[in-house]
A protein has these predicted regions:
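A residue-level signal for conserved active-site and pocket-lining positions in enzyme catalytic cores
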Residues: 9, 46, 67, 125, ...
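Short glycine/serine/threonine-rich phosphate/pyrophosphate-binding segments
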Residues: 46, 68-73, 96
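Glycine-rich beta-strand-to-loop/alpha-helix junction loops that act as flexible
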Residues: 10, 64-66, 89-91
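Short, glycine/acidic-enriched loop or turn micro-motifs at the edges of active sites
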Residues: 12, 70, 93
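A glycine-rich beta-strand to alpha-helix segment
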Residues: 59-64, 68-69
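ATP/NTP phosphate-donor binding region
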Residues: 1-61, 75-76
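Catalytic core of DAGKc-family lipid kinases
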Residues: 31, 40, 79-155
Length: 155
């Protein structure tokens, strides 16, 4: 039986993830026999959910959120032994990784493009006990990113 976990960050993109959650669930239900949906409530949730899904033998983990949700989900899959296919729908402020991979920034278009038979390998790096898949930064950049308020993100 094929199983997929969907991790949704309900506050990503000013709440946009909630608006597209059912569309993603419907699309993935045409590709997997069982779909489980989990909503994040705070930091670390996506990592824990993804790790648990991999350890339970899920075939795929998809997330819907911004760069932080993508990063957390990748960390969970890595901690779970890289046993799941990873997919994501960008609904964040920057969506850096999706831009680098050529994934449409419009969530509806990104959902329509999902094809579980068309996957690609991405590189994963590790720094200390954290994994990263798109970039790593040190010094001023992460400090500035950490200090941006939700209100400033919407400007």
């Amino acid at each position: 039986m094929s199983r997929c976990l969907i991790i949704i960050n309900p506050v990503s993109g000013g709440g946009a993830a909630r608006r597209y959650a059912l569309d993603l669930q419907w699309k993935l239900s045409t590709l997997f026999e069982t779909i489980e949906v989990k909503f994040t409530r705070g930091e670390g949730d996506a990592t824990r959910f993804a790790k648990n899904a991999c350890e339970r033998g899920f075939d795929a983990v998809f997330c819907m959120g911004g760069d932080g949700t993508v990063n957390e989900t990748v960390n969970g899959i890595a901690q779970g032994g890289f046993s799941c296919t990873f997919g994501f729908i960008p609904v964040g402020t920057v969506n850096d990784m999706s831009r680098a991979l050529g994934i449409p920034q419009n969530p509806t278009q990104a959902i329509r493009r999902i094809d579980i038979n068309e996957t690609r390998t991405i590189d994963i790096g590790r720094c200390n006990d954290r994994y990263f898949c798109n970039n790593i930064a040190a010094g001023v950049i992460p400090k500035v990113v950490d200090e941006v308020t939700p209100k400033e993100k919407s400007i």
